[in-house]
């Protein structure tokens, strides 16, 4: 009786689950059947769609497509390439009569026709039968076949590394383009973690060295790539994390006077999995990166943003205080909330740090310094920080100048597409803080529009008003965009990168693109996810979901009115002098308009007022004038003769009348002083090591300057661990040559005794040699974890169960450990027909069941850092699923209730055959 009751509950749940999922942006199933119709959203089991291509275009990121038994002919390249999507996976082997409940490819034969042979095996693994009868479109000698073959060949180049390909006659190799060159393409299979998809991207310039980096979100972590040589990108390291479709990344950099060096941290959020906020230490670049912590202020968040910073240098804007916003998190209903970066290696909540109602999907900020700060922000300071809240069905403007007294300023909406087809996704503000560009992620897919970017005037912060829009030539979805000068750089999904001229913000003009997704330009979730146009070099970073990292060169900046630029990337200044900074109007072929540009000084290691006099202003060129313009900066006098070399920055912005920003839009001003040789410190402050580990390597880094030779000495000292009894005595000197910034290491030998004892610690302390300087971590604590009292981890597996032949099977283990030691995992097959395990070194693995019935036995082993392990086995019985027949037809009206009864009885029988897990 209990079993039958449970079955009735399951049947009831079938009719409720889809309504529940309808409130979620992702993680829904879409259904396809031979007898379906290509209407609606394909998310109702009783109303499946007919074609795979249509269903994919209704899906959101993270959804999956379930295909019922039948024959499906692939007649377009669109469907062909959607079958390879990692973001919206497609599975065959389902049955519409059991409501797509169980995958059974051997029973529910799902045939695909017109599939190239090299795509056959992966699709078989997804539950499809491939009809290889020699009649594929790819075997025909027709124009259509040749076009498909060319598209397929172009698609395969997406998995190949490419460098230095100029855009000529609308193409850069296999990539369609206009005014954008390919400097380098780093495909997903070049990343060390071997991810199957990528997501968002951000950039970083290390102000200690000038090196440039890409930080790209991957399905399984965040990779940091050195792009200083843009034609030879090199991965520095990857910080691994849980698998997820969604990651977002931002960087904050600050100058640490105690070590006279710039310090930088990256903050990565995750959605779709509970992996907290990943804080990454970027201070060992270019040698390595490391995890600081998984900060638990939230379990997950869709996006992250840092306000009051310059997005090229990732440093604080003059006179402002940076704060970090977590967006779309599991707290506060998804409303954004702010955190202090006073201690950048962690997150500290700010008072009253969440507000309003609704879910913030993404955010940006602007700083108002004109009369609106008093008349509309009611702020009496130098500026008003306005947070732009992209809130699903509207954009909201908030005054976050004082995060403890945040107020709503205004709300903007639009009505050119039905509310049900809207999703206010993201956007950015113009450099003059007068307009916002807004992206809607659903208006193409659900509203039937071509790519559409809406422009809002915020001249009245209390009443944001749409004043224009850009409509693209394709239906590709516009995703994320950023303003640099009078260009708008936008990830445009299947169209790749799109660049708009926003000289007239209300009427943008398409001036360039680079198509990172070669098969199509449909409103699907393939192609370019993110873009970052702020590197000092001017190179553009693009992340593509299926093909990885692109480094691009912008050729949209050529203008008859010229390019405005500093004469070099840096200049030198002496203490106490007034320097002249020159700005050029270059390459002006028809300078018939007056132009202007703004300049602003940004503090670095040199501080405004104490080291230089702050300045900001506008430079003007009359029509037909191409002479250099200049402004002066006063450098303060060093009264102590003890100041080290310092620097600050000058940036150009807001070029007018179609002039553009040139190669050098940022200038570093280096003030002379004493030469610094950098500082030496341990990379981390502590570690725990197993007593039976043997030799322990401990890394040290030279941070800041690498000028001159430096040395440090080190010495071990006892705490609860005794030198000579628990660890061998050691001391020595470590040297760095002039120009050497490589990481060094020292070794200590742990003594493994046979006593049962508590954890014990000892210290390694650094000392300067001949005037060298120490950094932050001058003492390193080593905790020895006793292996004699160690207990093995405890492994729990799911119960033995039945699976259908040909089905995709997921197996999951849980592990606990009394000592909370780091773990490694391994799934292995010990009996049965051979299978291939995916993610065999993770807690959750998967495989495709064989086509023959029988038992499959798997073993899972968890091993702790001290070498103790535990294993458990799991037996899965592979069975041929029963054939599910359609319910009896309804003969007439009077027999309708009887048919429903038969149908319910039929569903009870089907579901009761399944083993409850």
What are these regions (language model features)?
Residues 21-54, 71, 137-140:
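Right-handed parallel beta-helix/beta-solenoid
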Residues 61-89, 93-98:
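N-terminal extracellular ligand-recognition/capping segment immediately after the signal peptide
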Residues 102-567:
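Feature marking well-ordered beta-strand scaffolds used for ligand recognition
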Residues 556-792, 883-885, 889-891:
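Short boundary segments that mark the start of a structured unit
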Residues 820-826:
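Solvent-exposed loop segments of extracellular immunoglobulin-like
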Residues 822, 867-873:
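A structural signal for beta-strand boundary/capping segments at domain termini and interdomain linkers
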Residues 828-847:
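Surface-exposed, flexible coil segments in extracellular/virion-facing regions
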Residues 900-917:
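A cross-kingdom C-terminal cell-surface attachment/processing module
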């Amino acid at each position: 009786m209990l079993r039958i009751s449970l079955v009735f509950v399951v049947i009831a749940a079938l009719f409720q689950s889809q309504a529940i999922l309808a409130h979620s942006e992702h993680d829904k199933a879409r259904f396809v059947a031979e007898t379906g119709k290509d209407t609606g959203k394909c998310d109702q089991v009783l109303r499946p769609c007919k074609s795979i291509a249509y269903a994919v275009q209704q899906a959101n990121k993270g959804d999956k497509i379930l295909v019922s038994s039948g024959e499906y002919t692939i007649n377009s390249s669109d469907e062909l390439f959607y079958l390879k999507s990692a973001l919206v996976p497609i599975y065959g082997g389902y049955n519409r009569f059991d409501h797509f409940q169980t995958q059974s490819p051997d029973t529910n034969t799902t045939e695909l026709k017109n599939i190239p042979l090299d795509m056959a095996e992966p699709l078989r693994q997804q539950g499809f039968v491939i009809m290889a009868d020699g009649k594929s479109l790819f075997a025909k000698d027709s124009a259509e076949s040749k076009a498909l073959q060319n598209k397929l060949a172009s698609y395969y180049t997406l998995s190949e590394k490419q460098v230095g390909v100029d855009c000529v006659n609308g193409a850069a190799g296999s990539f369609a383009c206009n005014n954008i060159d390919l400097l380098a393409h780093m495909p997903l299979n070049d990343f060390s973690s071997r991810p199957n998809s990528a997501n968002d991207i951000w950039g970083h310039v290390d102000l200690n060295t000038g090196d440039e980096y890409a930080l790209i979100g991957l399905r399984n972590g965040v990779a940091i790539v050195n792009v200083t040589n843009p034609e030879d990108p090199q991965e520095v390291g990857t910080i691994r994390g849980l698998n997820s479709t969604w990651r977002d990344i931002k960087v904050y950099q600050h100058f640490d006077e105690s070590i006279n060096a710039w310090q930088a941290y990256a903050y990565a959020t995750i959605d779709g999995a509970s992996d907290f906020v990943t804080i990454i230490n970027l201070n060992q670049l270019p040698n390595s990166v490391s995890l600081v912590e998984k900060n638990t202020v939230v379990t997950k968040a869709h996006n992250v943003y840092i306000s009051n910073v310059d997005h090229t240098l990732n440093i604080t804007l003059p006179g402002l205080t940076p704060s970090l916003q977590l967006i779309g998190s599991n707290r506060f209903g998804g409303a954004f909330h702010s955190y202090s970066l006073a201690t950048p290696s962690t997150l500290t909540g700010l008072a009253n740090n969440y507000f309003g109602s609704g879910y913030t999907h993404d955010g940006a900020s602007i700083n108002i310094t004109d009369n609106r700060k008093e008349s509309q922000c009611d702020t009496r300071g130098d500026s008003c920080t306005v947070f732009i809240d992209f809130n699903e069905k509207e954009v909201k403007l908030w005054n976050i100048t004082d995060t403890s007294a945040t107020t709503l300023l205004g709300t903007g909406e639009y009505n050119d597409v039905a509310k049900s087809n809207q999703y206010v996704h993201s956007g950015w503000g113009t450099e003059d803080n007068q307009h916002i560009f807004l992206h809607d992620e659903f208006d193409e897919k659900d509203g039937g529009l071509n790519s559409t970017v809406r422009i809002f005037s915020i001249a009245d912060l209390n009443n944001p008003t749409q004043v224009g829009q850009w409509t693209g030539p394709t239906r590709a979805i516009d995703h994320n965009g950023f303003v640099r000068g009078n260009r708008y750089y936008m990830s445009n999904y299947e169209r790749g990168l799109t660049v708009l001229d926003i000289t007239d913000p209300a009427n943008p003009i398409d001036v360039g693109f680079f198509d990172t997704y070669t098969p199509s330009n449909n409103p699907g979730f393939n192609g370019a996810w993110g873009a970052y146009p702020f590197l000092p070099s001017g190179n553009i970073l693009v992340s593509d979901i299926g093909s990885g990292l692109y480094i691009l060169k912008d050729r949209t900046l050529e203008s008859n009115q010229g390019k405005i630029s500093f004469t070099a990337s840096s200049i030198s200044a002496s203490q106490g002098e007034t320097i002249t900074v020159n700005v050029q109007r270059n390459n002006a072929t028809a300078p018939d308009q007056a132009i202007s540009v703004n300049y602003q000084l940004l503090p670095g290691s040199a501080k405004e007022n104490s080291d230089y006099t702050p300045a900001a202003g506008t430079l003007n060129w009359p029509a037909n004038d191409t002479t250099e313009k200049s402004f002066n900066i006063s450098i303060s006098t060093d009264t102590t003769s003890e100041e080290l070399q310092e620097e600050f920055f000058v940036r150009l912005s807001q070029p007018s009348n179609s002039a553009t920003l040139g190669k050098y839009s940022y200038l570093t001003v280096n003030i002379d002083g004493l030469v610094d040789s950098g500082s030496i410190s341990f990379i981390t402050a502590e570690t725990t090591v197993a007593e039976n580990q043997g030799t322990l390597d401990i890394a040290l880094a030279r941070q800041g300057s690498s000028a001159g030779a430096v040395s440090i000495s080190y010495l071990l000292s006892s705490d609860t661990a005794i030198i000579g009894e628990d660890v061998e005595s050691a001391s020595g000197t470590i040297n760095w040559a002039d120009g050497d910034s490589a990481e060094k290491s020292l070794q200590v030998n742990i003594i493994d005794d046979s006593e049962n004892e508590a954890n014990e610690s000892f210290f390694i302390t650094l000392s300067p040699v001949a005037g060298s300087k120490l950094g932050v971590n001058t003492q390193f604590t080593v905790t020895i974890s006793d292996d004699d009292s160690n207990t093995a981890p405890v492994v729990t597996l799911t119960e033995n169960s039945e699976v259908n032949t040909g089905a995709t099977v997921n197996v999951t283990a849980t592990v606990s450990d009394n000592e909370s030691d780091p773990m490694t995992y391994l799934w292995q097959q010990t009996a049965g027909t051979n299978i291939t395990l995916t993610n065999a070194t993770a807690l959750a693995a998967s495989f495709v069941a064989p086509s023959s019935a029988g038992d499959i036995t798997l073993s899972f082993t968890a091993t702790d850092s001290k070498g103790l392990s535990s294993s458990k086995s799991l037996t899965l019985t592979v069975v041929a699923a029963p054939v599910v027949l359609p319910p009896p037809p309804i003969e007439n009206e009077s027999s309708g209730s009887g048919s429903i009864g038969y149908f319910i009885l039929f569903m009870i029988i089907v579901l009761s055959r399944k083993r409850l897990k």
